[in-house]
Amino acid sequence: MGDNITSIREFLLLGFPVGPRIQMLLFGLFSLFYVFTLLGNGTILGLISLDSRLHAPMYFFLSHLAVVDIAYACNTVPRMLVNLLHPAKPISFAGRMMQTFLFSTFAVTECLLLVVMSYDLYVAICHPLRYLAIMTWRVCITLAVTSWTTGVLLSLIHLVLLLPLPFCRPQKIYHFFCEILAVLKLACADTHINENMVLAGAISGLVGPLSTIVVSYMCILCAILQIQSREVQRKAFRTCFSHLCVIGLVYGTAIIMYVGPRYGNPKEQKKYLLLFHSLFNPMLNPLICSLRNSEVKNTLKRVLGVERAL
């Protein structure tokens, strides 16, 4: 047994048990989604950096969300594409651990950034006269750094608990990428502590922040209903709707996967939920956040020269 434990240093990702034609179709489709993700989020970052009118707390946090989405995609999609072209090409032990760590880091950071964005929206709508005094750049930077730091630290805990585990079972991960629960199934030691820490991290990183978001939106809704101007009300509702769509996509899939009974789903269903979470969410987030935002759309028109053409 000891020899087996030390010999397994490479692993195969077997998330796509399909024929060659379907593999090539998925390769083209996922490549397209990957390009759209990079272009969409990259466009948001470019517009925010180019237009001084977008140098506000709301867009500062949106730029961090775009960075997380780009990082999400870059951590998982390239490896998926490699697996589709070369199913027998293994991933190293170090590569597996790094992918698991980064996925967890970006997931936690994204959840916390959405909480921060909810707080920013709460201050903007419920305390508009004090907004600039409350949301100073020092506060914004502190909130963003705290989100990233918390994501890294919580993921380090999982990594520290994962590294000592012996892996003596067949080195086949039946998943699209090295998700922590899929990796734990390969361990030939007791993983109850690891699984309990994943559940505890999911509850603290999902249910707690989501409760904060719900409270914030209850206050926001009360404040919006008291606004006299119908036009201002509609603009506030549009902003809230876009943000809530992103929250629903991110938190909805994550809670179903990690917090429900036995992590919420049969193995295959959970695997495809994770695919949606890591592939489609980063692509959809910039569209949802920006296409309904008039300031971002106007900046894009100016950059593309649409206004001059009209």
Curated annotation (Swiss-Prot):
Domain of life: Eukaryota
Pfam family, one: 7tm_4
Subcellular location: Cell membrane
Single GO cellular component term: recycling endosome
Keywords attached to this entry: Cell membrane, G-protein coupled receptor, Glycoprotein, Membrane, Olfaction, Receptor, Sensory transduction, Transducer, Transmembrane, Transmembrane helix
GO molecular function, one term: G protein-coupled receptor activity
Membrane topology category: Multi-pass membrane protein
Residues that carry a glycan: 4
Entry keyword annotation includes Protein transport: no
UniProt-listed GO biological process terms: detection of chemical stimulus involved in sensory perception of smell; positive regulation of cytokinesis; regulation of actin cytoskeleton organization
Transmembrane segments: 25-48, 57-78, 100-119, 139-157, 195-218, 236-258, 272-291
Similarity field: Belongs to the G-protein coupled receptor 1 family.
Name of the protein in question: Olfactory receptor 2A4
Organism, scientific name: Homo sapiens
